[in-house]
From Swiss-Prot:
Membrane topology value: Single-pass membrane protein
Entry cofactors: Ca(2+)
Record: residues binding Ca(2+) 3: 335, 339
Stated name of the protein: Calcium-dependent lipid-binding protein
Positions of the SMP-LTD domain: 66-248, 66-250
Amino acid sequence: MGLISGILFGIIFGVALMAGWSRMMTHRSSKRVAKAVDMKLLGSLSRDDLKKICGDNFPQWISFPAFEQVKWLNKLLSKMWPYIAEAATMVIRDSVEPLLEDYRPPGITSLKFSKLTLGNVAPKIEGIRVQSFKEGQVTMDVDLRWGGDPNIVLGVTALVASIPIQLKDLQVFTVARVIFQLADEIPCISAVVVALLAEPKPRIDYTLKAVGGSLTAIPGLSDMIDDTVDTIVKDMLQWPHRIVVPIGGIPVDLSDLELKPQGKLIVTVVKATNLKNKELIGKSDPYATIYIRPVFKYKTKAIENNLNPVWDQTFELIAEDKETQSLTVEVFDKDVGQDERLGLVKLPLSSLEAGVTKELELNLLSSLDTLKVKDKKDRGSITLKVHYHEFNKEEQMAALEDEKKIMEERKRLKEAGVIGSTMDAVGMVGSGLGAGVGMVGTGIGTGVGLVGSGVSSGVGMVGSGFGAVGSGLSKAGRFMGRTITGQSSKRSGSSTPVNTVPENDGAKQQ
């Protein structure tokens, strides 16, 4: 009896033990599944969602990294960099040199690479963020840092000197957006779109050093190069502008990837008030330049000896992306050599409502970069009338063709020597964008004009660096003419480039 009861007890105990073990494992498994579900749910919550749930008990140590680290990719990039650098050097030279020529500042006759190597230090990818905004595309944002040791020497030629300039201590901080257009054929990518995000703002730091000379040999050279680099980045690479690269030889329509005009901004530059005088004798001769993209820059006529000029000239500018682009207005004093800026202001297009005309009075600033603003004095204001018109499909295609025609006309006139650069501000001819452009060079254009004064007249060069007789002397002459002869000084003329269309023809008067 004792043996049988012992066997039964053992069987019952074993079954109970197995049942208990099975139940415990099932419970642990269900807890793991529930925990995984909770973690998945928490992982999908944003910082704001967690703050709503936790309230005042929200842990400050919780972070939400926007970019994933890719140490493996940095290791691969460092190994491949010598080969990438050598291949990229020719590509950069072939693609950037034409941009330097198109965007070179007035007064510089040549701007090319004398030396170009990318060095031995590879860029570092701080992180990658993969997103999907549109079907058939994969968008990848790359947080890029590069403190390399490239050897970059620019050959700079001006009217007064020729000097090689070395870019040292180059550092690049930017977030690049790379869009892959997917395809159903190997290599499964038909095109790549590359751009730099506007926010955070791309930062390119460097030091300029003259090789075998001095930067002072060409007055204002450092600022000219800074402006050129900044303009190329903003006008060619910074989103919404982009570079579209076909991949794999797959025939595909890339028109959807290219930047297209969204609308046009009709701007009437009405007047300026209480401008800052930059002249020792007489008053400034102000004119205004306006642009959304620096390569499509237009200017008003110059009003002589007036700190409260009234222009009342209208221009039409194409906008590619209303949400990210801005209208920039700069006021200059027309002078011999380099025209001096009196002030500038920027108006975001996102603040405008389509189909509504606004009249705005905007205060002029010494710089758009608040960190560089040293002069806090009032620089006056400028009054604008603005109207944003959104394009339909037909208007969009017509505007795209007009942009091409304008660029071709600018390049043709640059080659003919009528303007010094495609970046020169010009006046618009006719009522539409397709009517063409009349070229009126900036203060550093080329040409010969008659310079009159209240006392005498003469011939002066409109140029940079060597304008011995020009608007500066004509101002003195006009001042003396007004002082001595009164009304006879009204015949004083300003420098007018030959073989050009008068500026007044370019503006629609209101």
